[in-house]
């Protein structure tokens, strides 16, 4: 078959992995309780094993010591024997589906915060401040070094006693082990610093202690960085030397290799490459390490497509491929390949909604798959057909919520008609994909196009549904996903040009859609600070405009996630876009052929002016709810959603009334932005939890 390389089993130590695909270690925020794995945690990994993933490495940055705090992502706490029975439940859930599971263990040293959990004193080889967390730490003392080494050994013991298949020691992204490796962090002059051998000593002693505790048959891997990409950091040649050194000990069963350090905001963006990066941008680093070691090498960074993964393996670059975000988007991707259903794989688009939520201390969710990480609630990845009557379902609006509503209703076996006023489905995704760094987000729409065609949804494009259109179909259920429209009328002072009969300001939608030609000297005012404002700035600068983006927030793009805003800032700085904070757009007026934008400082009230030829405003959207109010009184439930049932992921009570009185009208629901403007995930989540019980 075309994917033979993916399905070839491999030995790691004494462990046989059924295929070459790995879900690598990452944080599973809010899936633990006091550091203990929960039902949510177990179900999340069980779904991946059920879907065919060969190896799951769970527990990104799981601490071995109480002075390596769990940080904001609530990682697994392996510093106590209380974790052992929790591991046993996790191991059983994965093993019964033929998968293998390991956990990443670490001491994060200085790369954490001191002001949470037990308020620890952070440790580092030389007490040098870590910039991203703004944490100043103490220089670790000899006695503490040996205590932490033993903590690693005891953590490994707990993993083994819990029935997991191995551990991955984290020596990447400036955790304590690689802090000792780094001359820019390790300034010691004792046996733990200075020479190469001395800087390697801490990691070596950790390996010795771990092996003494778990024996030679238990799998122990080492995750490393192939190049820190820092002026004073460890280079690729340095890392190959380090890998070869530890490989020669015979105590390492595999290496996980990724590119880039992450102790600055800029380098953090490299670690989990978003859609602006090319495929597998750091594969050459893993391949370089593979050349100097004798054990299997795993690489994971921007490997999202099975054809891409197969090509990497066939080329011999690495031995296993990490497809972590790909499994967040679709935990059944391996099973779909095996069933020759690759076109049904919900492919990751690199939006980084998952990881960016983690860095905000929120649970890890997928922008397009609302069932991921909610398996414990009963939200399904595969929609089962209804065992009730076949219904007529009308969906109005072909954005994210409407596409998901139509898909889920059709999977349930109902007759579904989807109306979309535009000539294509996609809604705001279509706009987002026009921005320079966002084109891959169109993959969400492409997947829905294939699914809706497979399910034979009656797709009526270029058709604006109204009361009569809907009445003609005599539906049982109507779902409104009509979205929203740019909200430009909030401030009348933004102005209206009587002579030209149009607003003095235009929206980011106008710019990205091409409805309005870009100006040459443009001011963008962004009060929302999500993707639209910085995307419009990037787009306009690409078109040759001189651009200033102004916000009344702390910075432009303030709500764009931690792995994503740096790529925008790189681009905007390179294109000489001016970024200004703390100014609100107070007034716009015309002066001859120019526009004058009056800006007001949020803190002092002082005003300043910009003279430009175009003012672009990003002020969010307002619900497009006219059709809802036109239909509300015709519906049997008056358009109301039972919020207790919604939040409990239970069927909507109104659905049970459909067989009571055939003349009582249809059941009406609205979801997504036409209820309250939010985001793509919210619209899809609304649709799944409402429509799964049709």
Curated annotation (Swiss-Prot):
Its cofactor is FAD; NAD(+); NADP(+). Optimum pH is 7.0. PANTHER family: BINDING OXIDOREDUCTASE, PUTATIVE (AFU_ORTHOLOGUE AFUA_2G08260)-RELATED. The keyword Flavoprotein applies. It comes from Chromohalobacter salexigens (strain ATCC BAA-138 / DSM 3043 / CIP 106854 / NCIMB 13768 / 1H11). GO terms for molecular function: FMN binding; oxidoreductase activity. Ca(2+) increases the activity by 12%, while the other metal ions tested have no or slightly inhibitory effects. The chelating agent EDTA inhibits the activity by 33%. Optimum temperature is 60 degrees Celsius. Keywords: Cytoplasm, FAD, Flavoprotein, NAD, NADP, Oxidoreductase. The gene is ddhC. Its EC number is 1.5.7.3. This is N,N-dimethylglycine/sarcosine dehydrogenase. Can use both NAD(+) and NADP(+), with a preference for NAD(+). In the N-terminal section; belongs to the NADH:flavin oxidoreductase/NADH oxidase family. Disruption phenotype: Disruption mutant loses its ability to grow using DMG as the sole nitrogen source but is still capable of utilizing sarcosine and glycine as the sole nitrogen source. GO terms for cellular component: cytoplasm.
């Amino acid at each position: 078959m075309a994917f033979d390389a993916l399905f070839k089993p491999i030995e790691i130590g004494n462990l046989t992995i059924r295929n070459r695909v790995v879900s690598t270690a990452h944080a599973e925020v809010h899936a633990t309780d006091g550091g203990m794995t929960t039902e949510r945690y177990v179900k999340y990994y069980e779904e991946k094993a059920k879907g065919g993933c060969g190896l799951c490495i769970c527990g990104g940055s799981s601490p071995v010591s109480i002075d390596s705090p769990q940080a904001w992502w609530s990682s697994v706490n392996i510093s106590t024997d209380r974790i052992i029975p929790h591991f046993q439940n996790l191991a059983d859930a994965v093993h019964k589906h033929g998968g293998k599971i390991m956990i990443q263990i670490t001491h994060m040293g200085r790369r954490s915060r001191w002001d949470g959990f037990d308020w620890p004193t952070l440790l580092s080889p030389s007490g040098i401040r870590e910039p991203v967390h703004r944490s100043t730490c103490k220089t670790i003392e000899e006695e503490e070094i040996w205590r932490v080494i033993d903590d690693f050994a005891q953590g490994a013991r707990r993993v083994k006693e819990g029935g997991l298949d191995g551990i991955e020691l984290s020596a990447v992204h400036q955790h304590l082990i690689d802090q000792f490796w780094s001359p820019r962090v390790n300034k010691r002059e004792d046996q733990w610093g200075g020479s190469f051998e001395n800087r390697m000593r801490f990691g070596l002693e950790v390996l010795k202690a771990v092996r003494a505790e778990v024996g030679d048959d238990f799998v122990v891997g080492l995750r490393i960085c192939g190049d820190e990409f820092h002026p004073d950091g460890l280079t690729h040649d340095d890392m190959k030397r380090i890998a070869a050194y530890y490989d020669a000990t015979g105590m390492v069963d595999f290496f996980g290799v990724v590119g880039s350090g992450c102790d600055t905001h800029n380098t953090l963006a490299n670690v989990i490459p978003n859609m602006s990066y090319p495929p597998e941008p750091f594969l050459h680093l893993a391949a370089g390490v593979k050349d100097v070691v004798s054990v299997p090498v795993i690489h994971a960074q921007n490997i999202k497509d099975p054809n891409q993964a197969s090509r990497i393996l066939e080329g011999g670059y690495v031995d296993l491929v990490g497809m972590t975000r790909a499994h967040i988007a679709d935990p059944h991707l391996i099973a779909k390949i095996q069933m020759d259903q690759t076109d049904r794989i919900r492919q990751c688009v690199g939006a980084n909604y998952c990881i960016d939520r983690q860095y905000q201390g929120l649970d890890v969710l997928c922008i397009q798959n609302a069932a991921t990480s909610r398996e414990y609630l009963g939200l399904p990845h595969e929609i089962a057909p209804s065992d009730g009557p076949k219904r007529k379902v009308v969906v109005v609006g072909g954005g994210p919520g409407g596409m998901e509503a139509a898909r889920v209703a059709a999977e349930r076996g109902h007759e579904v008609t989807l109306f979309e006023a535009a000539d294509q489905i996609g809604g705001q995704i279509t706009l987002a994909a026009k921005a320079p760094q966002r084109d891959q987000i169109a993959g969400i729409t492409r997947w829905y196009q294939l699914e809706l065609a497979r399910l034979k949804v009656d797709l009526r494009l270029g058709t604006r549904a109204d009361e009569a259109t809907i009445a003609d179909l005599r539906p049982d259920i109507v779902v409104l996903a009509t979205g929203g429209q740019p909200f430009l009328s909030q401030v009348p002072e933004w102005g209206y040009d009587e002579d030209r009969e149009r607003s003095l300001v235009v929206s980011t939608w106008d710019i990205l859609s091409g409805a309005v030609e870009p100006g040459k000297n443009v001011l963008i005012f962004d009060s929302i600070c999500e993707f639209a404002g910085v995307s419009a700035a990037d787009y306009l600068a690409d078109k040759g405009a001189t651009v200033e983006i102004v916000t009344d927030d702390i910075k432009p793009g303030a709500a764009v996630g931690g792995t994503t805003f740096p790529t925008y800032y790189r681009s905007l700085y390179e294109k000489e876009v001016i970024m200004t904070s703390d100014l609100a757009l107070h007034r716009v007026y015309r002066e001859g052929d120019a526009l004058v934008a009056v800006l007001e400082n949020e803190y002092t009230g002082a005003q300043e002016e910009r003279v430009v030829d175009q003012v672009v405003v990003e002020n969010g959207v307002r619900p497009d709810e006219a059709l809802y109010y036109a239909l509300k009184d015709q519906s049997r439930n008056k358009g109301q959603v039972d919020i207790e049932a919604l939040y409990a992921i239970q069927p909507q009570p109104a659905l049970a009334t459909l067989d009571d009185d055939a003349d009582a009208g249809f059941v009406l629901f609205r979801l997504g932005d036409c209820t309250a403007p939010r985001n793509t995930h919210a619209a899809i989540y609304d649709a799944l939890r409402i429509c799964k019980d049709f």
